[in-house]
């Protein structure tokens, strides 16, 4: 277990998988309370836990992408990996700040009063960042090419859909699917 367990490839994959697990818990809490239909959380503590899992998912994704960048830094995909990791980090800082400020404002009683511009910037940065990560995976040849292509197509496709769609574009699930796929592939490849 020793050397493979502590490899950067295994570590990056594990952190990316954990990011999806954190998102899943937060999204499940949101779904249980009927958040999609505008349902309020039962308590403020419940709301804090729900949003904290979403925040944790963003932080873990940023860490996982940074580890992936370190793995790819000396490959043909090194530049795109670095651009992707840094862009996601910048976007992540913005959405964590937006989520954290929502904790202080209460239970989203009037979400129109909340400043979600940082979350919108996060959405664009996260999609572009992960498209760059997909390109870096294609250039590096570390994982099967379909993973790189799927990452590029998924993220550019959502970006184009958001350009057409009006209204709320902050759907955290969108930004954690491909990191999960990449994470599983990295862990499988490392073992």
Protein language model features and the residues they cover:
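Hydrophobic, aromatic-enriched alpha-helical segments typical of multi-pass transmembrane helices
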Residues: 1-191
């Amino acid at each position: 277990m020793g050397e493979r367990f502590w490899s950067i490839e295994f570590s990056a994959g594990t952190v990316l998988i954990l990011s999806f697990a954190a998102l899943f818990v937060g999204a499940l809490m949101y779904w249980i309370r009927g958040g999609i239909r505008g349902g309020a959380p039962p308590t403020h503590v419940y709301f804090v836990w729900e949003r904290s899992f979403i925040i944790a998912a963003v932080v873990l994704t940023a860490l996982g992408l940074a580890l992936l960048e370190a793995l790819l830094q000396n490959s043909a995909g090194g530049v795109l990996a670095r651009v992707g990791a840094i862009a996601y980090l910048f976007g992540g800082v913005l959405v964590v700040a937006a989520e954290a400020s929502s904790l202080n404002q209460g239970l989203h009683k009037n979400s129109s009063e909340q400043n979600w511009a940082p979350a919108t910037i996060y959405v664009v940065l996260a999609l572009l960042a992960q498209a760059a990560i997909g390109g870096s995976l294609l250039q590096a040849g570390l994982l099967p090419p379909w993973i790189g292509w799927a990452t590029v197509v998924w993220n550019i496709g959502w970006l184009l859909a958001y350009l057409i769609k009006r209204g709320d574009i902050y759907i955290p699930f969108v930004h954690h699917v491909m990191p999960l796929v990449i994470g599983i592939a990295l862990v499988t490849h490392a073992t």
